[in-house]
Amino acid sequence: MITGTYKLAGTVIRVDSLHPSVHTLCREYASEETPDFGVTVTPGDIRAEAERSARQDMPEDYLETMAVYRKIAEAMPSFDTLLFHGSAICLDGEGYLFTARSGTGKSTHTRLWREVFGDRAFMVNDDKPLLKVTAGGVLVCGTPWDGKHHLSTNTTVPLKAVCMLHRGKENEIHPVSPAEALPALLEQCYRPERTEAFLRTLTLLNTLSGTVAFYRMHCNMSAEAAAVAHAAMSAPHEPAVRKPDRVSDQSR
């Protein structure tokens, strides 16, 4: 076994792997702190990832990186943290998360933000960020599992808003209620197999849906799309009063 310790979303994790690739992937998140929990990958875990994969030619070391993140995602609800499928960008110190079905253009849209806003914007994670629910709000956190363009930053920023993207000829964005947003949130977050972790995930999603603002946007691939999205999503938002039975202290 090859062992390394890494800090993701404020949680310290020991990783025991069969291949070195996952440790290379996570090197910018290395930590010397005492682990909060550990994950160990077996050959069976790698075979299971191969069965899930749409491609049959994926190398074992890559499949192992996915197995590691799956095990981390299974454990993270205990630390008030969710794995989410989306592209997260930070602008002026606030996080904005775009989610949609694969191929819609999440990465293209956040690229437009970087082009329009320049140095004011940077990527938090372009594919699978972590969302940490705290007593002070929701944080969006970088991870090394950052998509085919490998765009991420080892950082944690307050999550301002979430937008569900759809392709359109014109750029139109509208706020949606937490009740409207919840099905999309559930679809795009990792749903643990363990009952306890899944129920905790539902609680955290309920809190998230009452804390941040949600929008639905139909957009094209023009620079105007970024300006329209930011103008709406950066507006003041009054959160609903919705707290889970337990949330993390943000300072943890």
Question: Where do the model's predicted regions map?
Answer:
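A noncatalytic interaction/capping subdomain that flanks phosphate/NTP-handling catalytic cores
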Residues: 1-102, 112-122, 130-252
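Hydrophobic positions on the alpha1 helix immediately C-terminal to the Walker A/P-loop
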Residues: 109
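Conserved lysine of the Walker
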Residues: 106
